């Protein structure tokens, strides 16, 4: 991958990372304020349900941040944009759509097919 593309994806990943960190902080701030402002039991139950959803979202953000950090490390070590299974280049279109991709479309489809077969066998 050329340096221009690497810079583009580094910037895209860093912007995505910053956005997720801000959203995570907002979620945390919201959860803290929710804890203080609880009324009756029905309201508490409703808020707890909402908080569970927010915590799940926060966990997804954490996992996504880990994948973004891994992609940034691959940019630094020169392996970004190459399939971890086949070593082939991952298409720019795929990386544009999913900059954290580690597999080509074909390799991803093979992996998903294998996982479906394994799941169906058990």
Regions found by a protein language model. Give the residues of each.
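Amphipathic alpha-helical recognition patches that constitute DNA-binding helices
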Residues: 8, 85, 99
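Short cysteine-rich clusters marking metal-coordination/redox-active sites
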Residues: 83-87, 104
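Short functional micro-motifs and their immediate structural scaffolds
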Residues: 90-91, 112
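Residues immediately within or flanking Cys/His clusters that coordinate Zn2+
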Residues: 62, 80, 101
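Short Cys/His-rich "knuckle" micro-motifs
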Residues: 93-97
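A generic structural signal for ordered secondary structure
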Residues: 75, 87-89
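Interaction interfaces in information-processing and related assembly proteins
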Residues: 1-77, 114-122
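Cysteine-rich micro-motifs
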Residues: 101-108
